């Protein structure tokens, strides 16, 4: 899987928007414990009714512990924080390939919706150029990014811990790569 392909020009166009967190829906909820520059808990309401295949895969990976100790490898200020590379993104390992991998599970066909838009706190699935190549990586929006609508699958909304998302260490490398020690998802669980 290649890195999320987005124009660097578009990144600069978005400033961090203030806004309320989404209301918690029927779930399931993805609960992410974060350590590093950011410390705390992020709760994401997964939208099983919108993206059932993607939510099933995320839920399975979290239940298996695959997301535990995976870093936020790509973080672009005013845009998004990306994580979920369970193959190359484990803390303490060689992170030079972080963002290029996925899981041993099959890629998932796109589940686009016209009913939702990429806004602050929305969670989307990262993918390669093929819209049907999402696997394990996901990103959390710092600010609106409607240009992603119909291009990337929306899988959830942050319902608690947006202040933790806002504190995630920003990338300073090419295309938002985080140098030094990136923040890490120490434990990821699923709650009904």
Where are the model-predicted features located?
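Cyclophilin-like peptidyl-prolyl cis-trans isomerases
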Residues: 2-5, 18-192
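Sec-dependent N-terminal signal peptides
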Residues: 5-14
